[in-house]
UniProtKB/Swiss-Prot annotation:
Pathway: Purine metabolism; AMP biosynthesis via salvage pathway; AMP from ADP: step 1/1. NCBIfam families: adk, PRK00279.1-2, PRK00279.1-3, PRK14527.1. It is found in: Cytoplasm. This is Adenylate kinase. Consists of three domains, a large central CORE domain and two small peripheral domains, NMPbind and LID, which undergo movements during catalysis. The LID domain closes over the site of phosphoryl transfer upon ATP binding. Assembling and dissambling the active center during each catalytic cycle provides an effective means to prevent ATP hydrolysis. Some bacteria have evolved a zinc-coordinating structure that stabilizes the LID domain. The gene is adk. Monomer. Catalyzes the reversible transfer of the terminal phosphate group between ATP and AMP. Plays an important role in cellular energy homeostasis and in adenine nucleotide metabolism. GO terms for cellular component: cytoplasm. Zn(2+) binds at C130, C133, C150, D153. One of its GO terms (biological process) is AMP salvage. It catalyses: AMP + ATP = 2 ADP. AMP binds at T31, R36, G57, L58, V59, G85, Y86, P87, R88, Q92, R160, R171. It comes from Anaeromyxobacter dehalogenans (strain 2CP-C). The keyword Protein biosynthesis does not apply.
Length: 214
């Protein structure tokens, strides 16, 4: 089974991808993991990605597509895989379709996790992280024992610039602009299923398995 996970920032795609990977016994492939893997291995792609990111640029479709092609050539994807963070655009989706066709494969389902904007803002803007050890908390869902301070090393917690409400709303707007055409692409092909992204991770997993007939 080949699954594509879509959803706004804070929708819990990564959590669901990990849970589904365990449930279905297929690898979870994320763009972030691929970037880190190539950088760690010192590949040519990894060097290109590092140079672009050091310069504050965006990784091009060509580089991202090349990473996906390399990853899908590995034997562990034979029973299927879960893509998280790719494709992000219709151009990438068309490339992926062509790549899968060349491998004699096709997408099983594109799952779109639907979460209201205000809930996304609440989820993300409530995050706090420790600048010393990297631990992440949430002011209401996973608060530290002492408000504002890390449980591990007592460092004062900080809110990332990206996690401030105004910036979360900006990211949501960008997500809508880029992803609505992608959702339409998969909907027109009869491959899109929307899943309510509100609830516990286990509850959302149960809803996901239901739409997959599992």
């Amino acid at each position: 089974m080949i699954l594509i996970l879509l959803g706004p920032p804070g929708a819990g795609k990564g959590t669901q991808a990990k849970l589904l990977s365990t449930e279905l016994g297929i690898p979870h492939i994320s763009t972030g993991d691929m970037f880190r893997d190539h950088k760690a291995r010192g590949t040519e792609i990894g060097k290109q990605v590092q140079a672009i990111m050091d310069g504050g640029g965006l990784v091009t479709d060509d580089i991202t597509n090349a990473m996906v092609k390399e990853r899908l050539s590995r034997p562990d994807v034979a029973p299927g895989f879960i893509l998280d963070g790719y494709p992000r655009t219709v151009v990438q989706a068309e490339y992926l379709d062509g790549l899968l066709r060349s491998l004699g494969r096709s997408i099983g389902r594109a799952l779109s996790y639907e979460v209201a904007e205000e809930l996304v803002v609440e989820r993300i803007s409530g995050r706090r992280s420790c600048p010393r050890c990297g631990a992440v908390y949430h002011v209401s869902q996973n608060p530290p024992r002492r408000a504002g301070y890390c449980d591990r090393d007592d460092a004062e917690l900080v809110q990332r610039e990206d996690d401030k409400p105004e910036n979360v709303r900006k990211r949501m707007q960008e997500y809508g602009t880029k992803t609505e055409p992608l959702k339409r692409y998969y909907r027109d092909r009869g491959e899109l299923t929307e899943v309510e992204g509100v609830g516990t991770p286990e509850g959302i997993l149960a809803a996901t398995k239901k739409v997959l007939g599992r």
